[in-house]
């Protein structure tokens, strides 16, 4: 139940923050709080269950992957770049998505391949699922779940086809994700299927907020710029 799980994630974050304060500490759910260290993620393991039978629609009676499984992966590959403002909602979120940092840089998919944006874990057929490794721990769980499941749903509805599974390193492939929040918002605004799915007014309002946040960030001159470019 994605809604119940989102409730649990929200409650967990609030609880951790409250306990930390009581111990005279601060807990952060920033995606990339420390330079040179891996960031903090919120990987989503997702599958689709038939409401009538309780069966995982990603596996058939013989235990093999179904067409719906591959359509779902293709939907993630197609629509997650435009959904990035929900998975990586802040300017800091994109610092986490770099090579050799236990975080993805593209939407290649592979079997038990942790260098890919989309990983298919080794599992029993009834537990067949896709791990979306893009979301950071700073993401709103309700929005991240809705965007990720929605992208997979669009792939199933449109019967999209995924790329071939990657057997090598995803870090050797080109970057295919927005590099910062401003680019991500532009992709979201251009993606009509996500607008139809999530609601035009909601997407327009959310994008406007994120554009404002990025503009405020962009006006700040960083210490790095002063150190290397001032003189």
Predicted regions located by residue number:
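Active-site capping/gating regions of soluble enzymes
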Residues: 3-166, 170, 174
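A broad detector of the eukaryotic-type serine/threonine protein kinase catalytic domain
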Residues: 1-2, 193
């Amino acid at each position: 139940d994605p809604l119940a799980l989102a409730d649990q994630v929200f409650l967990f974050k609030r609880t951790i923050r409250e306990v930390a304060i009581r111990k005279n500490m601060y807990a952060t759910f920033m995606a990339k709080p420390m330079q040179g260290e891996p960031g903090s993620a919120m990987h989503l393991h997702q599958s689709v269950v038939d409401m009538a039978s309780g069966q995982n629609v990603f596996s058939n009676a013989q235990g093999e992957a179904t067409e719906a499984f591959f359509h779902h992966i293709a939907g993630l590959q197609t629509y997650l770049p435009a959904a990035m403002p929900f998975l990586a909602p802040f300017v800091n979120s994109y610092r986490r998505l770099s090579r050799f940092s236990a975080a993805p840089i593209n939407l290649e998919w592979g079997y038990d391949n942790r260098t890919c944006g989309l990983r298919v874990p080794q599992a029993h057929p009834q537990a067949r699922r896709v791990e979306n490794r893009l979301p950071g721990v700073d993401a709103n769980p309700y929005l991240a779940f809705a965007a990720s499941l929605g992208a997979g749903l669009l792939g199933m509805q449109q019967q999209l086809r995924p790329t071939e599974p990657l057997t090598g390193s995803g870090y050797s492939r080109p970057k295919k994700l927005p590099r910062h929040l401003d680019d991500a918002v532009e992709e979201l605004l251009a993606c009509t299927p996500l607008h139809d799915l999530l609601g035009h007014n909601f997407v327009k309002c959310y994008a406007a907020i994120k554009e404002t946040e990025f503009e405020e960030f962009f006006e700040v001159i960083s210490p790095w710029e002063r150190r290397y470019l001032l003189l």
